[in-house]
Swiss-Prot record:
Single GO BP term: bacteriochlorophyll biosynthetic process
Superkingdom classification of source: Bacteria
Name of the gene: pufQ
Function: Required for bacteriochlorophyll biosynthesis. Directly involved in the assembly of both the B875 and B800-850 pigment-protein complexes.
Family designation: Belongs to the PufQ family.
Record-linked InterPro entries: PufQ_cyt-su
Lineage: Bacteria, Pseudomonadati, Pseudomonadota, Alphaproteobacteria, Rhodobacterales
Intrachain disulfide bonds: none
Protein name: Protein pufQ
Alphabetic keyword roster: Bacteriochlorophyll biosynthesis, Chlorophyll biosynthesis, Photosynthesis
Amino acid sequence: MQSQRLRAHGVQHVDRVPRPEFALYFSLILIVAVPFALVGWVMALVRERRIPECGPFARAWREAGEITPEIFRP
C-alpha cells in the first residue's frame, strides 16, 4: 500500500497516531468504569450462579475502548 489513506464508501480515512489526549481520556474513563464493571460482574455472578466469561477489568477495558473513540470522532 503506497499511501496511508484508505477509501471506504467515498470517505477518506487517514491512519492516526495515538495522541497523549487519547491515552489520558482512555485511562480516566477506565478508572471510572472499573467500579461499575465490578458491580455488574458481581451482580451477574449472583444472578447466574457462575463466573462470567470476562472479568470486571476486561469489561471496563472494553467499555473504555468503545467510549473514548466517540469523543474524538469528527
